[in-house]
Every structure is written in C-alpha cells, then in structure tokens.
UniProtKB/Swiss-Prot annotation:
Organism per entry: Dechloromonas aromatica (strain RCB)
Family statement: Belongs to the UreD family.
Role, per record: Required for maturation of urease via the functional incorporation of the urease nickel metallocenter.
Main location: cytoplasm
InterPro entries xref list: UreD (IPR002669)
Cellular component terms (Gene Ontology): cytoplasm
Keyword Cytoplasm annotated: yes
Short name of one Pfam family: UreD
Xref: PANTHER family: UREASE ACCESSORY PROTEIN D
Name of protein: Urease accessory protein UreD
Lineage: Bacteria, Pseudomonadati, Pseudomonadota, Betaproteobacteria, Rhodocyclales
MF GO annotations: nickel cation binding
Localisation: Cytoplasm
Oligomeric form and interacting partners: UreD, UreF and UreG form a complex that acts as a GTP-hydrolysis-dependent molecular chaperone, activating the urease apoprotein by helping to assemble the nickel containing metallocenter of UreC. The UreE protein probably delivers the nickel.
C-alpha cells in the first residue's frame, strides 16, 4: 500500500516537514513492503530484492539532498514477524548552515518477533553553522535481530571547512524486549573544548558507531570479537570494539568518512552471517 499523507506545512514556511513510514511483513518466503506512506520529500521508490525474496531492500530518498534550519524529518519502520528489511541511502546526508532555526531528524524502528532489520545509511555531514538534532530509537522483540550504523562528519573537510559554529545534539537508544541495551546521548557547540580534548574528539572530524544485536550474541561474542579485531580502518584511525551483554559496539574516530564506511562494511561482512543468517551482499547503490 502506497499513499500520500495530507500536507500540513504552512505556506509561508520554506522548511520541509517530512515523514516516511514503512511497514514490512512476511508473506510465505517473501518479505513485502506492505506500507509506504510519506509526506513531503522523504520517500522510497520501490522494494528491491537483490539477494532473493527473503530480504526486502529499500533506499530512502530525500530529494532536496540536504536538511536546512527549520526542517523536521521523521522516518519510521515496522518490521513484522519473521520478515527481513534492509534500509540504506543513496548518498551522504547533509545538514546545512542554519539562520537560527534548529533542524531535526527522528528515526524510530520496531522489529517484531523473529524479524531482522539492517540500517546501513551513508555518512551524515554537518556543515559549519548548522543547528541539528538527530534521534534514533530501535525497539527489538526478544528474538529479533538488528545491525546498524551512523557516521557523523563535522564540517566539509575536503573544502577546508571545520565545524566551528552551530550546535549538534544526538540521541540513540536500542531496547530489547522493552529494556534498554544501549543508550547514548551527546551534544556540543562548534566551540566546545570537547572537540579538541584528548578525552573527546581529539581534533578528529569523523565519528562512527556500529551496533549489532541478536539473540545468540552472548554465545558467539568471543569468536566474533576476535575476527572483527583483525580488521582495522585503512587510515589507521582510532577505533575500538566492545562486547556488552546484549550488543556489540564498534567505534571509529578519525578524519575519513570513506575509511569509516569501508571499515564498518568489512565488519558487517563478518557479523551479518551470525546476526542475520545470510552472507553479506553489498548493496549495489554503494557502488554508484
């Protein structure tokens, strides 16, 4: 089912107020996109099946290509019992300089019994002067599976720009059976000493986090950590992997979004068979 929600954006406002809701369900051996509702520029074009009917891949599109001050985006997905959804994006997300208004993006995922979700977006670039808030919440059933990442770039390093003005706030929570297994909250201004402190970003411009959670994780943690620790970012950046009771956490801190993305993709090729029960198949959109 595909429908367009009524537009409620005020005519005098140039900002985007966009929503996208996706619903996935199991139909025999096939995962189907049963709901695809959108308002504003957020949307997916169609369901893709690059590795057979069991996994439904969707590419989340934001046509204006960036988020400006006053924009508010909401992305939600429900992955129904026994289904397998993979969400990715065609390019980097961009948070533009703001004239004063805050922009926000809220992502909310619900993963049902025996279901699997992969959230594999490309990097997010925060322009100097942006005022942005990103919130992500993932609610897992007792036996569902999740692997996802976020890569945050402060400033446009290739253009010689650093994040020196503005504000960025981040919230991330993953729940298993209504109990949190990971909570992360942070916020900083462009002039925050934490960005250059050895105890903080240490002058780096790119930070990434990968999370992987699945029911068998406690029994496989040792072997998977050993395999993952043999892989390091190509640029030699600071990185680490941690095994918590219900989730694996991988961290990147450096200056290359490409190195972070490639490292996470290599970790994903190791983790996906254990987490999702399937070999890694690189999304074709990553190569375009």
């Amino acid at each position: 089912m595909t429908s367009r929600l009524p537009i409620s954006q005020p005519e005098h406002s140039p900002s985007w107020h966009a929503e996208l809701h996706l619903g996935f369900a199991r139909a025999g051996e096939r995962t189907v996109l049963r709901e695809n509702r959108h308002r504003g520029p957020l949307r997916v074009q169609k369901a893709l099946y690059p590795e057979g009917e069991a996994v439904c891949q969707t590419i989340v599109l934001h046509p204006p290509s960036g988020i400006a001050g006053g924009d508010h985006l909401a992305i939600s997905a429900e992955v129904g019992e026994g289904s397998h959804a993979q969400l990715t994006t065609p390019g980097a997300g961009k948070w533009y300089r703001s004239g004063g208004a805050e922009a926000s993006q809220r992502v909310a995922f619900t993963v049902g019994e025996g279901a699997t979700l992969e959230w594999l977006p490309q990097e997010t670039i925060v322009f100097d002067g942006a005022r942005a808030r990103m919130e992500t919440q993932v609610d897992l059933a007792a036996d569902s599976r999740y692997i996802g990442w976020d890569i945050l770039c402060l400033g446009r390093v290739a253009a010689g720009e650093r994040f020196e003005k503005g504000r960025f706030d981040l919230f991330l929570q993953v729940n298993r059976d209504q109990r949190p297994i990971w909570i992360e909250r942070g916020g900083f201004d462009g002039s925050d000493p934490m960005l250059i402190s050895p105890a903080g970003w240490a002058g780096a411009t790119v930070c990434g986090t990968l999370l992987c959670a699945f029911p068998e994780w406690p029994m496989q943690a040792s072997a998977l950590l050993e395999a993952c620790r043999k892989i390091v970012p190509a640029d030699g950046a600071q990185h680490g992997l941690s095994a918590l009771p219900g989730v694996l956490i991988a961290r990147y801190l450096g200056n290359s979004s490409e190195a972070a993305r490639l490292w996470f993709a290599e970790l994903w090729t190791i983790l996906r068979p254990a987490c999702c029960g399937r070999p890694a198949v690189i999304p074709r959109i990553w190569n375009t």
